[in-house]
Amino acid sequence: MQWEVVIGLETHTQLSTASKIFSGTSTAFGAEPNTQASPVDLALPGVLPVLNKGAVERAIQFGLAIGATIAPRSIFARKNYFYPDLPKGYQISQYEIPVVQGGSITIQVEGKKGEVYEKTVQLTRAHLEEDAGKSLHEDFAGMTGIDLNRAGTPLLEIVTEPDMRSAAEAVAYAKALHSLVVWLGICDGNMQEGSFRCDANVSVRPVGQKEFGTRREIKNLNSFRFLQQAIEYEVQWQINEIEDGRKIQQATVLFDPDTGETRAMRTKEDAHDYRYFPDPDLMPLEIDAAWIERVRGELPELPAAMQARFVSQYGLSAYDASTLTASKAMASYYEAVVAEVGAANAKPAANWLMGDVASQLNREGISIDAAPVKPLQLARLLARIADGTVSNNTAKKDVFPAMWAGESNGDADAIIAAKGLKQMSDTGELEKIIDDVLAANAKSVEEFRAGKEKAFNALVGQAMKATKGKANPAQVNELLKKKLG
């Protein structure tokens, strides 16, 4: 039987406010346990929550960026459940009327055969809520410690429709969402610190069946790699269970990165289990049109708009434009390079950024902001390739690595001069070298004239070797063809 995978994601995005959503306590990461917990966060009697305006504005920003509806009036609700790190016995969230409704995110997905296709993922909602505290299970002689520093941290929970049909699509969506919230500046995107966490709702059904299968929710996935591994394992587990004649039970599961397996944590709750009701301590959130338009006017150019501009202005492919706008820092770097080399060299600049620069960044595990070669320095190297001072191959093999290592303060001209890498510009000298190559390789000349194209490439190689790689390959080709008739 053929199976179809159905995936929906819920993403908890920590908003980049300096203080918590309902108190003035700091949200800074890494403080000593329980040093950033106010009476509101601790749920002490007689204290009331006060909504953080900055959290609301970040939610509006996100809603506008995805083409969603911003609710003119939304309500905060109490989500009731008992857990040691939830001191109130309930979490303040939004249920019936969220602040952000609908919207979509378009993603680029790499298929199984390497082809890239586009897909639009519809969003159900995004709602504001507070985070819970943290339970610590180590170093307490078998007991659990509670750190409430995180309690009350502002979250925007972003929920998709069950639109994704593979782990690859889910990861592509998560990466696109991560890029967007970081681009907007509403989240720092630090997955190691818990600023961006995904829950994956996964089910399978026979191909062609309209009804959804029973879903299981994989909680708190804090890396794209874990997201992919967890979904792939869960999908195969569910298929095996069904094919062995067992029914899938709705459940919340955890992913163990050490074993690569998911395991059930508890029976999955439904909404009625949480006994949602409007929070009597908070007034409804009212957002007028003027507020929305003010926030809209402060939005940066969005990734989708920039992608379209890169295609029309610089002649890039949709895939290249998507890659270069994966982060605001990368897009800014690229535009800074193009500003120096001109639109005519926009494509070579893109190739360098997605090729050699990206390879070095990945090798060292750093972001483009930390790249030792700055935009102006890379632009100077591209200019030397364009004016024929060095070949593209020499630039890649000899000049760029030296720039990255900080030789001559990363100055391309100084490195070219110091290493003697400048291409030959004397046509007469090059013609003499080619004459010598032809005389020394009579057999290759005969083979070429007999119709063997490989012989021509061999002659080009010999000429480049004779010039120690300093000749312009295009000029070598031209002169050889001229002399060979």
Curated annotation (Swiss-Prot):
<keyword id="KW-0547">Nucleotide-binding</keyword>
<dbReference type="InterPro" id="IPR003789">
    <property type="entry name" value="Asn/Gln_tRNA_amidoTrase-B-like"/>
</dbReference>
<dbReference type="Pfam" id="PF02637">
    <property type="entry name" value="GatB_Yqey"/>
</dbReference>
<comment type="subunit">
    <text>Heterotrimer of A, B and C subunits.</text>
</comment>
<dbReference type="GO" id="GO:0006412">
    <property type="term" value="P:translation"/>
</dbReference>
<dbReference type="GO" id="GO:0005524">
    <property type="term" value="F:ATP binding"/>
</dbReference>
<keyword id="KW-0436">Ligase</keyword>
<dbReference type="InterPro" id="IPR014746">
    <property type="entry name" value="Gln_synth/guanido_kin_cat_dom"/>
</dbReference>
<protein>
    <recommendedName>
        <fullName>Aspartyl/glutamyl-tRNA(Asn/Gln) amidotransferase subunit B</fullName>
        <ecNumber>6.3.5.-</ecNumber>
    </recommendedName>
</protein>
<dbReference type="InterPro" id="IPR006075">
    <property type="entry name" value="Asn/Gln-tRNA_Trfase_suB/E_cat"/>
</dbReference>
<dbReference type="GO" id="GO:0050566">
    <property type="term" value="F:asparaginyl-tRNA synthase (glutamine-hydrolyzing) activity"/>
</dbReference>
<dbReference type="InterPro" id="IPR023168">
    <property type="entry name" value="GatB_Yqey_C_2"/>
</dbReference>
<dbReference type="InterPro" id="IPR017958">
    <property type="entry name" value="Gln-tRNA_amidoTrfase_suB_CS"/>
</dbReference>
<dbReference type="InterPro" id="IPR018027">
    <property type="entry name" value="Asn/Gln_amidotransferase"/>
</dbReference>
<keyword id="KW-0067">ATP-binding</keyword>
<comment type="function">
    <text>Allows the formation of correctly charged Asn-tRNA(Asn) or Gln-tRNA(Gln) through the transamidation of misacylated Asp-tRNA(Asn) or Glu-tRNA(Gln) in organisms which lack either or both of asparaginyl-tRNA or glutaminyl-tRNA synthetases. The reaction takes place in the presence of glutamine and ATP through an activated phospho-Asp-tRNA(Asn) or phospho-Glu-tRNA(Gln).</text>
</comment>
<dbReference type="InterPro" id="IPR004413">
    <property type="entry name" value="GatB"/>
</dbReference>
<dbReference type="Pfam" id="PF02934">
    <property type="entry name" value="GatB_N"/>
</dbReference>
<dbReference type="InterPro" id="IPR042114">
    <property type="entry name" value="GatB_C_1"/>
</dbReference>
<keyword id="KW-0648">Protein biosynthesis</keyword>
<dbReference type="GO" id="GO:0070681">
    <property type="term" value="P:glutaminyl-tRNAGln biosynthesis via transamidation"/>
</dbReference>
<comment type="similarity">
    <text>Belongs to the GatB/GatE family. GatB subfamily.</text>
</comment>
<dbReference type="InterPro" id="IPR017959">
    <property type="entry name" value="Asn/Gln-tRNA_amidoTrfase_suB/E"/>
</dbReference>
<dbReference type="GO" id="GO:0050567">
    <property type="term" value="F:glutaminyl-tRNA synthase (glutamine-hydrolyzing) activity"/>
</dbReference>
